[in-house]
Amino acid sequence: MIIELPVKLYQNLVNHAQKEFPKECCGLVVGLINDDKLEVKEIFPMTNLDDSAEHFSMDPKEQFEVVKEVRELGYEMIGNYHSHPFTPSRPSNEDKELAYDEEAIYFILSLQKSVPVLKAFRIKKQQDVSEIKIRFIKNGEE
């Protein structure tokens, strides 16, 4: 499996994380799901109700509005994203404990170094973590 992510959406995600720094940012990732690839079509920044550099909790009202919009667009929920302002882009113990949806993709953007690093994971049984390759797409091409 591979994730295709337009560079423009990646930059939107980075901008969201930098705007919220030093707090964690969070949001939803939607698109088209095929057998061998996930095509990201849109990201939806959410409010982090925890207002924290170490935790995030999405606003349920905002989530509900996004779910309605996603249905109207004909897309599917791929997963969610959040930033790690001071740590690497890998799931923390808390991230794993809160990963209840085994089909969701968890995108984590690290701002720990000068160049942001985005990685994507699937988490099974709240402990088995597997990284999924992200292919960045520019103007419809790799």
Residues covered by each model-derived region:
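Short, well-ordered beta-to-alpha junction loops that form the rim of enzyme active sites
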Residues: S83
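Conserved beta-strand-loop surface patch within small alpha/beta domains used
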Residues: M1-M77, F86-E142
